[in-house]
Amino acid sequence: MSRLTIYADSTPDAPLLRTEDPERIAQELSSIGVRFERWSSAVTPSPDDDEATILAAYRPYLNALMGETGAGTADVIRLRPDTPNLPALRQKFLSEHTHTEDEVRFFVHGSGNFILHVDDRVYDAHCTQGDLISVPTGIKHWFDAGETPFVTALRVFTDTTGWVAHYTGDPIADHFPAA
């Protein structure tokens, strides 16, 4: 189930809000410019389906989303316990960073946490199958799918070079493990 936990950035042990209500999650994230939606699809591909099958299953949604955002490409990312170089890959995502384009993800299977650092607040958005999240350009954040991840997600990019992080050097992510 999707969940949002909000903290003051100085108190990782004291949540200010914790909700599993999708409407409240969308409302709270919208207040900081983050888009959150639940998508329902008549077709849910298997976790083992190839990238082309997964992209085809969500093509109507992707076409609409890419038209709205001006995105030029989409792909599928999978994180599993047997993903090559998983510890190094995970560390790339765990460090606070920004992007020069919106980071748009749709969770096909599994779950992961987008943790956003905005002003003096930390927003931990636990996303699950059927969740769409779009983190605007420049918002400081990190991502955690856990030490034994199981996630398949669609990624939408404006820049065809794909995922490029600009690390902030702030160690805040070390103090806010995924809720």
Swiss-Prot record:
UniProt KW Amino-acid biosynthesis keyword: yes
Annotated positions for site May play a role in metal incorporation in vivo: 96
Top EC category: oxidoreductase
Residue numbers marked as site, Important to generate the dianion: 105
Cofactor note as given: Binds 1 Fe(2+) cation per monomer.
Residues annotated for Fe(2+) binding in this entry: 97, 99, 103, 141
Site feature: May play a role in transmitting local conformational changes: 102
EC number: 1.13.11.54, 1.13.11.53
Binding, Ni(2+): 97, 99, 103, 141
UniProt keywords, alphabetically: Amino-acid biosynthesis, Dioxygenase, Iron, Metal-binding, Methionine biosynthesis, Nickel, Oxidoreductase
Catalysed reaction, written as an equation: 1,2-dihydroxy-5-(methylsulfanyl)pent-1-en-3-one + O2 = 3-(methylsulfanyl)propanoate + CO + formate + 2 H(+); 1,2-dihydroxy-5-(methylsulfanyl)pent-1-en-3-one + O2 = 4-methylsulfanyl-2-oxobutanoate + formate + 2 H(+)
Transmembrane segments: none
Record-linked Gene3D superfamilies: Jelly Rolls (2.60.120.10)
Involved pathway(s): Amino-acid biosynthesis; L-methionine biosynthesis via salvage pathway; L-methionine from S-methyl-5-thio-alpha-D-ribose 1-phosphate: step 5/6
Gene Ontology MF, one: acireductone dioxygenase [iron(II)-requiring] activity
GO biological process, one term: L-methionine salvage from methylthioadenosine
Domain of life: Bacteria
Cofactor(s) this protein cannot do without: Fe(2+); Ni(2+)
InterPro entries documented for this protein: ARD (IPR004313), ARD_bac (IPR023956), RmlC-like_jellyroll (IPR014710), RmlC_Cupin_sf (IPR011051)
CDD domains documented for this protein: cupin_ARD
Family (UniProt): Belongs to the acireductone dioxygenase (ARD) family.
Subunit details: Monomer.
Biological function: Catalyzes 2 different reactions between oxygen and the acireductone 1,2-dihydroxy-3-keto-5-methylthiopentene (DHK-MTPene) depending upon the metal bound in the active site. Fe-containing acireductone dioxygenase (Fe-ARD) produces formate and 2-keto-4-methylthiobutyrate (KMTB), the alpha-ketoacid precursor of methionine in the methionine recycle pathway. Ni-containing acireductone dioxygenase (Ni-ARD) produces methylthiopropionate, carbon monoxide and formate, and does not lie on the methionine recycle pathway.
HAMAP family on file: Salvage_MtnD
Protein name: Acireductone dioxygenase
Taxonomic placement: Bacteria, Pseudomonadati, Pseudomonadota, Alphaproteobacteria, Acetobacterales
